[in-house]
Structure formats: C-alpha cells, structure tokens
Amino acid sequence: MMKYTIRNRHTIGIIALVIALCASCSFNSPSIAFPKVQRLYKHTVEEDFVENLAVFAVFQDADGVNDYKELLLQENATGLEWRLHRGNTIFLQESGFSQHEQWVGSNTFAYPRGAFPAGAYTLTLSDLGGNTTSHVFTLQKPPRVTARPFQFTVNRETWQIHVKNSSFCCYFSLVMLSADLQPLRTHHLGKKETETITGSLQELIDFVPDACYIQCFSENQDRSIGFFSAPIPVP
C-alpha cells in the first residue's frame, strides 16, 4: 500500500507539472497593428546631424501583453538585423487599450553607415511561445539634411522657434528633460504655419519644476521625418 501511494503521488506530481507547463505556454499567435516608422534627426552641439529610426507597432495577443518576447527589424536587401528583447523595448500604453494590446518599439535604431537606405524592411514581433507575425514597409529615400530646419532659442522669460525650412517644420513639440536628459513632459504645439513661434517659458516650468533642459521637436507634413534641437539648459 505504501509503494502504491508513493507511486501515485509521483504520477500526480508529473501531471501537475505538465499542466503548469501547458498553462505557461503561448497558444495564440500575436498580430501587428498601426505600425509607425519615422526618421529622426538630432542636432548635435558640433552642428552635425545624427539619424535614428523610430519603429513602433501595437502588439496584439490574446494571451496578454506579457506574452511579448522580442521585436526584429530587418533590411530586406542586405539581411541586416536589429533585435529588441523585452529589456530594451519601449512599452507605451494608450487609453482605450485592452490588456491584450500595447505599443512596442524603439526610437534608437541606428544604421552602421549613416542614414537608413531606401527600400523594403520587415518588422517581426514574436511571443514567448515562438509565434511570430510580420509586416513589410518601405522607407523612402532619406532627405538631404545640410542645415537646421529651425532655430530654437530660450531666455529667462520666453522660448522662440524660427522656421528656416518649412518642408520639415509642420508640427512642433517642446520636450522638458531631466538632468540626465530623460524626457519628463512633452508639450504639443500642434500644426504651425507661421515663421516665428513664441511662448512663455515659465508656463512650461510650472508644469515641470524639476526640468533641467528643454528641447524642440519638429515633424514634416506626413510625420515621416522628425528633427530634435540640441537640449538647452533651463535658465
């Protein structure tokens, strides 16, 4: 009787383990929604520009957003790959989203030789069960950037944007940054068609008293290209 009991307990333990493993498996394939791609140009102190590619998409999975494993970006012509694991993925939640959908991606993809070439790219999302879903998109030829499309200045009372190239300057935002240049708050100015835009610096500081830097961000008409000014210390 004792041997039977031990064997029976052992069998029950194996069954419980199998059930636990099955419960942790991912049975549903994920899907991609609302993919967004944008070339980002950062103006450095050395009067130069650095390009990064921002790639985001909504990860949808019936098993929940915690089933997300990684994002893979591939240049189809060369096979070059950029891989994001959970640890270096940016997760963004949006009002109205369920527990089965979440924005995933990054704005720091960098090409090894300057700007990302025009052509086809494949975005692939995978879950913990090894299920994948892909989306192919096409990048247009990168713009020829030789000068800042706008000038951003700050004094103790006001901030000012002076537009130099309107083709790159349709929508504007102001980003308040921490001492280590992490974004604290983004103030969207919306679509602007005037050559000069001015506002109160104090109004921005009132929202984020601990901000140490301020940065301007512009986007073109279809928001496929964005420009960051160099961060300016808050006076």
Regions found by a protein language model. Give the residues of each.
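Proline/serine/threonine-rich low-complexity linkers at boundaries of modular beta-sandwich domains
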Residues: 25-37, 133-143
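Edge beta-strands of extracellular beta-sandwich domains
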Residues: 132-140, 222-235
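Low-complexity, Pro/Ser/Thr- and charge-rich linker/hinge segments at domain boundaries
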Residues: 139-162, 233-235
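Solvent-exposed loop/turn segments flanking beta-strands in beta-repeat/beta-sandwich domains
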Residues: 62-77, 82, 164-182
